[in-house]
């Protein structure tokens, strides 16, 4: 998983710099994961490796697509997790997502505390939760999020995805 980890570091650096994970990183990551799974995974026929890889890609997309649909995340972050899924299949994608969510939460809290804007962002958090529960139209939620974006602190989510996933890989012994 060294290739995936190196790709994640590059994506995180670019996301931190430009607030964007470019397609020239995510699409090759997805396709190379499919190719790797179809040709290099021992113990599986090519079609089964490819099937698990595509399933992992779909799980990665499904986990972050709702946040993207309501304007809470960029498409590059969604495709980055899909790329992870292409390489490590569905089960490890779930664990990488969980680790990334924990890291993202910690970073978000630290950012708010560092700027000393806890109460402002706490009230925005509850307002967003209320909107998600009451406004059922994803397009309206995305429009509301776009209006609010200039007042929000932005977290380039490629960073927590990279940190969380690499920490998970290390803990699971996948970097050996």
What is the predicted role of each segment?
Residues 1-176:
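A membrane-topology feature that recognizes alpha-helical transmembrane segments
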